[in-house]
């Protein structure tokens, strides 16, 4: 009863859909009941919109993250953001705003440390990763009235708490990322694959690296409500890996990965609604099955004789 339990905690009782035992959906109409309920329940519309928008942003940003081989960096930023979230929670401020500041500063700090050679990048990521989680847990526990549910909502996501302002912020970020991809796809692509070559072509690699690090941080923080800190890194990487199994073109991956992420998000949300399982886990499970299927199909094609 996970999905319905989350809803009854976050919306008024009369707004929640009727509490009844929902067994495994037995027919097509039951599966499609989710889409018909979108009209009746506003929070489902917000959840669906957030899934679509976060899928687009994570798909595009994930292409850069995977091709640049900075998945560990993205994981460090994700967990470091918990520090800002905990401090803001303790102060009574907006937790997402606190996480945003902490994540952006962490991303820029790691990028600066790596470029200056003052400290190894992997060491800096490991330090920020653990310190961020420790600071977040400490300050959240210091707030009066703290419960474990407050921590769980951010670690594993709580998609039914997505508000109109969250959707608006994701929409603005999506517009910025799409515009940036259309205008600067080639310079970003060169920077992701070979910074020395990009620098020889006159591309400002340092500026692009800092901007992309900040965008990675913003994308991660705005998607926390959907996936949670623990699972979010998979949404950034798995759609790219799925498409990369079929294509080696950066442009193709950048275009197809968001579509895969959106499809996985929506499918996971529908599964969560019908089977009463955590939305974040359902999304990752859906993407994992897709990845396994794609890998099996690609292996089968390689074994088929030509002609």
Question: What spans do the regions from the language model cover?
Answer:
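Cytosolic-side transmembrane-helix boundaries in multi-pass membrane proteins
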Residues: 277-307
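Structural signature of hydrophobic alpha-helical transmembrane segments
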Residues: 44-55, 93-104, 221-234, 281
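Short loop segments and helix-boundary regions at transmembrane helix junctions
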Residues: 63-146, 243-255, 272-275, 299-300
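Transmembrane helix-bundle core of multi-pass membrane transporters
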Residues: 34-37, 41-46, 125-184
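Helix-loop-helix "hairpin" substructures at the membrane interface of multi-pass membrane proteins
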Residues: 163-239
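Hydrophobic alpha-helical transmembrane segments
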Residues: 48-53, 96-101, 123-127, 167-172, ...
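Membrane-interfacial amphipathic/re-entrant helices at transmembrane-helix boundaries
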Residues: 10, 19-56
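Transmembrane alpha-helical segments in multi-pass inner-membrane proteins
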Residues: 226, 230-281
């Amino acid at each position: 009863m996970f999905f319905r339990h989350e809803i009854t905690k976050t919306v008024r009782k009369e707004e929640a859909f009727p509490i009844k035992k929902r067994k495994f959906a037995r027919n097509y109409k039951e599966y499609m009941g989710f889409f018909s309920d979108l009209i009746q329940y506003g929070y489902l519309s917000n959840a669906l919109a957030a899934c679509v928008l976060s899928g687009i942003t994570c798909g595009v940003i994930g292409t850069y993250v995977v091709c640049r081989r900075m998945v560990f960096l993205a994981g460090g930023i994700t967990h470091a953001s918990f520090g800002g979230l905990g401090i803001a929670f303790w102060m009574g401020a907006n937790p997402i705003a606190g996480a945003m500041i902490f994540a952006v500063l962490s991303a820029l700090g790691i990028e600066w440390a790596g470029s200056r050679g003052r400290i190894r990048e992997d060491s800096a990521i490991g330090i920020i990763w653990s310190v961020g989680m420790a600071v977040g847990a400490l300050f959240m526990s210091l707030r009066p009235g703290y419960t474990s549910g407050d921590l769980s909502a951010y670690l594993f996501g709580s998609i039914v708490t997505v508000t109109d302002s969250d959707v608006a912020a994701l929409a603005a970020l999506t517009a910025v990322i799409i515009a940036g991809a259309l205008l600067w796809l080639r310079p970003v692509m060169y920077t992701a694959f070979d910074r020395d070559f990009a620098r020889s072509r006159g591309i400002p690699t340092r500026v692009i690296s800092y901007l992309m690090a900040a965008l990675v941080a913003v994308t991660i923080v705005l998607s926390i409500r959907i996936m949670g800190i623990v699972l979010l890194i998979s949404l950034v990487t798995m759609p790219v890996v799925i498409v990369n199994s079929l294509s080696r073109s950066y442009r193709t991956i950048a275009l197809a990965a968001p579509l895969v992420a959106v499809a996985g998000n929506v499918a996971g949300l529908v599964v969560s609604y019908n089977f009463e399982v955590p939305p974040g886990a359902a999304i990752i499970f859906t993407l994992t099955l897709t990845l396994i299927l794609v890998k099996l199909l690609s292996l089968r094609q390689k074994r088929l004789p030509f002609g």
